[in-house]
Amino acid sequence: MFTIEVLAQKLAPHASFLGGLVVAAILGLFIFFQEKDRKVLDPVEWRSFKLVDKDHLSHNTALYRFALPRASDSLGLPIGQHISVAAEINGKQVVRSYTPTTLDDDKGHFDLVVKTYEKGNISRYLSLLTIGQEIKVKGPKGKFVYTPNMAPHLVMIAGGTGITPMYQIIKSSIKTPGDKTRLSLIYANIQEDDILLKKEIDELQAKSNGRFDVKYVLNNPPEGWTGGVGFVTKEMIEEAMPSSGVGSANHGEGHKVLMCGPPPMITAMKGHLAQIGYPAPRSVSKLEDQVFLF
């Protein structure tokens, strides 16, 4: 792999022929293109990023925007993976994992959607941040990496802030020319105000040319609600499955089920999937698994 130092060594013997100005110009162009799409995330070293904006999405959830060092920088996070966020709380370092809702196409910043829990150390820490304060981040982390057309159909089941990895995958797929992956999302929440990124999700569905469908499910729906009611059921999951899936000889062939949400919900979903005939997800899922748990 070329670096500035390696390039300089290769050009040095020809400096007298090329002339100092030409060598400098070549090095300058190399530096420009090397820095143009710089990825700033590091898997080992903690790096600090400043909070530049905070947008309250609901009574207990906010979107936090953090600036990257340069406007042309990208985070460098593969689709489907997450980052570690660290904070010093009561003299101890506390670390939690979050999936940004931005892609590497979104230059100069990254966004985190975080629900504040009363006993959530990092979520409370983030909620108290003021503009200009920093968080420490490293990554990428995770076993799942989305690539276009990796499966004919992705069935995604999310609850609450478990929408973030699903949203990232959906957003990337819809924006990628040539990606024909069918996407089905079941998104569960308690009440309508808890539905995160609904406007953005609905916009992606409108742009998908029919290959992305979403079913919202609420425990406490408002009057006139036309989506799902109660908890996510086995029947709701079956409806989201491809037509060649449930009850056929090639049951489940070629598609994946992705899940992310509160532990009680995930436990219930495992039971539903087992009844339909799907394997139980591993405690630590791997990319090749048909049922992947974030």
UniProtKB/Swiss-Prot annotation:
Q: According to its UniProt record, which cofactors does this protein need?
A: FAD
The transmembrane residues are 13-33
Q: Name one GO cellular component term.
A: mitochondrial outer membrane
Tree of life domain = Eukaryota
**Ranges in coiled-coil conformation:** none
Q: What is this protein called?
A: NADH-cytochrome b5 reductase 1
Q: Give the metabolic or biological pathway.
A: Protein modification; peptidyl-diphthamide biosynthesis
Which residues are FAD-binding?
127-142, 153-185
Summary of subunit composition and partner proteins = Monomer. Component of the 2-(3-amino-3-carboxypropyl)histidine synthase complex composed of DPH1, DPH2, DPH3 and a NADH-dependent reductase, predominantly CBR1.
Q: Which GO terms describe its biological process?
A: protein histidyl modification to diphthamide; tRNA wobble base 5-methoxycarbonylmethyl-2-thiouridinylation
One GO MF term, please? Answer: 2-(3-amino-3-carboxypropyl)histidine synthase activity
Q: Which reaction does it catalyse?
A: 2 Fe(III)-[cytochrome b5] + NADH = 2 Fe(II)-[cytochrome b5] + NAD(+) + H(+); 2 Fe(3+)-[Dph3] + NADH = 2 Fe(2+)-[Dph3] + NAD(+) + H(+)
